[in-house]
Every structure is written in C-alpha cells, then in structure tokens.
From Swiss-Prot:
Binds 2 manganese ions per subunit. Mn(2+) 1 binds at residues 9, 11, 34, 109. Mn(2+) 2 binds at residues 34, 53, 75, 107. Its cofactor is Mn(2+). Belongs to the metallophosphoesterase superfamily. YfcE family. This is Probable metallophosphoesterase MPN_126. It holds the Pfam family Metallophos_2. It comes from the Bacteria. It is an enzyme of class 3 (hydrolase). Keywords: Hydrolase, Manganese, Metal-binding. It comes from Mycoplasma pneumoniae (strain ATCC 29342 / M129 / Subtype 1) (Mycoplasmoides pneumoniae).
Length: 159
C-alpha cells in the first residue's frame, strides 16, 4: 500500500503543509499548484508537483504512475472556470488524451471528488485559502493498493 498526501493552493504558507506531512508521514506528496515557493522547497517536500497560475517555477502538467494507476496532475487554470461542473468536464476532456485513470487538480480552492467519463477527479481544496462553504482548509489522503484507490479521505484541519 502507498500512502499519498494530496494538497494544493498553499500560496507560500508552508507551516501547515509541513505539519500535515509530519502528522501523516506519507510515502508520496502531490501538490497541484499555486505553491508560491521555490523549486528547491518543492523538490524537497513534494514528490510530484505542478505550477499554478501564480507560480513562476514548475511544469504545467505532470503524468506519473503509482501502484499501476495512471495519474495526470494539473493546476486547473488550463480551462476557463465557468460553473464548477462544466469546469471539471473541460479538464477531464483535456486529460483524456493522456489515458489516465486519475486527474488531480487544484485552483478552485474547494475540495471535490467524482468520476467523470471514467476518470476519477480529485481536488484537495486549499490548505491555506479555502473557498468551501465552511471556509475550512482542506487536503486529501489516498491509500493506493493493487491498482486502485482503496481509501480517499478529505481532512479539515482547524488549527
């Protein structure tokens, strides 16, 4: 089993990110952009990461495989943000060309999980600037096992 921490939109506030990493001790850390920090910090603290619309370092899209699962990672600013349902559909349409099983995005600052056209879409929300109705910061943990996501949990830290 592989333990994965997924986060996004930390916007340069790294203390909570580092505390969450210490709390969960993940095997893999995925950051979906708007990190607003240095390449060195990202390389030291994230296994896979992309640039968001506020970042000056990083690739826009990463593709990788974990436990036999094909992932595409992008921030989400690659599609115009209309209503969220339409926005996710546009991102999935882009991701289809990569033949992925899972698409991880950020940008909206709102946690989300659903399957669209056979692709699992995960948005961990924002650890620092949440826009969900409760205005709580969010991140996500995944457990990967035998070619599938065996557990997906959103967390809402209050400290």
């Amino acid at each position: 089993m592989t333990k994965v921490l997924v986060l996004s939109d930390t916007h340069g506030y790294n203390d909570r990110w580092l505390a969450v990493m210490k709390l969960h001790n993940p095997d893999v850390v995925i950051h979906a952009g708007d990190h607003l920090t240095t390449k060195k910090f990202m390389d030291q603290n994230a296994t896979f990461w992309v640039a968001g619309n506020h970042d000056v370092v990083g690739e826009e899209i990463q593709m990788f495989e974990l436990e036999g699962i094909q992932f595409v990672l992008m921030h989400g600013h690659q599609a115009p943000r209309h209503d969220l349902k339409q926005w996710y559909k546009m991102l999935v349409d882009q991701a289809k060309s990569y033949l992925c099983d899972v698409l991880i995005v950020g940008h909206s600052h709102i946690e989300h999980y659903e399957t669209i056209d056979g692709i699992q879409v995960i948005n961990p929300g924002s650890l620092e600037i949440p826009r969900n109705p409760r205005k709580l910061p969010t991140y996500c943990n995944l457990n990967l096992s035998q070619g599938r996501i065996s557990d997906l949990t959103f967390h809402f830290p209050r400290d």
